[in-house]
UniProtKB/Swiss-Prot annotation:
Its main location: virion. The keyword Membrane does not apply. This is Major capsid protein. It is found in: Virion. Signal peptide: none annotated. Mutations in this protein confer resistance to host-encoded CBASS type II-A(GA) viral defense (in P.aeruginosa strain BWHPSA011 / Pa011); overexpression of this protein alone in the host does not activate CBASS. The above mutations are predicted to lie on protein-protein interfaces within or between monomers. It holds the Pfam family SU10_MCP. The keyword Hydrolase does not apply.
Length: 418
């Protein structure tokens, strides 16, 4: 112990004696973007999964046609085709090459008996590999009921995935006083919730279906959007031909197939494009290089922010998903999503199910019914459990794009001074 002579100042107290001055809660720093970190989790609908194997049935509209395998003369009435599935008596064929219409009168295996020149255009030679398009049916008055047709449903399987995260601290830590506004228990719980939410958001995009075992028990994971597109709509996976000079036409080519099919649950002219930071900048630059900007003297701000990208098939709502950049995906990544066609199918009672362990020191509430359990440990904690399967009803309405690294800059032509 010592005696100080002079004016007392703040450096003379032990550090522990000075009260700290700071904000009442801990600052939480998360990745930023025009979409929130939990963009998909916060907007998709939910439904119920009744088993760990969860799937759905889909039907894709079929437009009938027939491909002629051998040349047929102008007066030929029997045509041999590659496939006759779904063809029935009464259908009208249209030959785009010659303009002739003909009526199908009999299907015998791969041999079709037709009535030529069913219309104004005269019959002509039908070349091999000609595609005959079905443009409807035509029946006589008082006709018999036609052959029924139906589209066979396809089962699209997936599995549920169990997400678990926990929080825990010793009861001494629980009882210890912290700085004003800070709670050891609250912060531990909050960390648990953040991990639980972000892991599910990541799985929505990047999960893959798997069924196996671990510790003698079933272990299953769900298929995310990216893998579903790769499996069911591989033509919708596109890499930019020149990642450092991406053009408007490149983006059209990469997204057009996502508008080819629609389902009866949403807007068939709208999709959402989630980009990383680099991809978002590229989309902005494409718009910026696309037109002319006029600035007047009265303007006090400049610059442009594009939230939609339009072309002849529809429009894309452009969002920067902070998760893509945060987890380190290769720069220039984007996923086009038909959002109304995405749902999370939760198992009953397993949507962020809460369990608390050892409240008050670990030995109390052994018979409690409020999800609190003693476990004989001088600590307390808890867990969150969610189990769901991703239900993507329209993978053909989504797309995966890589290489959106830099927009092709505009070339300005300058004329020499007169």
């Amino acid at each position: 112990m010592s005696v100080y002579a002079g004016i007392f100042n703040t450096t003379l107290n032990p550090q522990e004696l000075n009260m700290k001055s700071f904000a009442g809660t801990i600052l939480r720093r998360v990745p930023n973007g025009s979409a929130p970190l939990l963009a998909m989790t916060s907007v998709v609908g939910s439904t119920t999964a009744k088993a760990s194997t969860h799937g759905y049935f889909s039907k894709t509209m079929v437009f009938a046609s027939a491909v002629v395998t051998a040349e047929a003369a102008a007066d030929a009435t029997v045509l041999t085709v590659e496939n006759s599935d779904g063809l029935t008596k009464g259908m009208i064929f249209y030959n785009e090459a010659t303009g002739e219409n003909m009526r199908l009168e009999l299907v015998n295996g791969l041999n079709l008996t037709v009535k030529r020149q069913t219309g104004r255009i005269s019959a002509a030679i039908i070349a091999a590999n000609t595609k005959l398009i079905v443009i409807g049916t035509a029946f006589e008055e008082g006709s018999q009921r036609p052959t029924a047709r139906s589209i066979q449903p396809v089962y699209v399987p997936n599995f549920t995935q169990i997400f678990r995260n926990a929080w825990a601290l010793t009861d001494t830590a629980r009882a210890s006083y912290a700085e004003a506004g800070y709670s050891n228990i609250t912060e531990s719980r909050r960390d648990c919730m953040d991990f639980h939410a972000t892991e599910q958001e990541t799985a929505i995009f990047f999960g893959q279906a798997f069924m196996g075992t671990y510790n003698g028990q079933p272990l299953h994971t769900t298929q995310g959007i990216v893998d579903a597109v790769r499996q069911y709509a591989p033509d919708n996976v596109n890499a930019m031909p020149n990642p450092t000079a991406v053009t408007y036409d490149d983006v059209v080519d990469a997204t057009i197939d996502a508008f080819k099919w629609s389902v009866n649950v949403g807007d068939n002219t709208q999709r959402v494009m989630f980009c990383d930071t680099v991809g978002m900048r590229t989309m902005q630059d494409i718009g910026r290089f696309f037109g002319e900007v006029t600035v007047t003297q009265r303007e006090t701000s400049y610059g442009m922010v594009f939230t939609e990208w339009k072309f002849f098939k529809g429009r894309l709502i452009i969002k920067e998903h902070p998760l893509f950049s945060a987890i380190g995906i290769s720069p220039g990544f984007a996923v086009v999503v038909d959002v109304p066609a995405v749902k999370l199918a939760y198992m009953d009672g397993r949507n962020a199910k809460v369990e608390n362990y050892g409240q008050g020191g670990g030995e109390n509430k052994s018979g409690a019914t409020d999800y609190s359990y003693g476990h004989g440990v001088d600590a307390q904690g808890g867990s969150l459990t969610s189990e769901w399967a991703l239900e993507l009803l329209n993978p053909q309405g989504c797309a995966v794009i890589t290489g959106l690294q830099k927009a092709k800059e505009r070339v300005y032509l300058t004329a020499p001074a007169p």
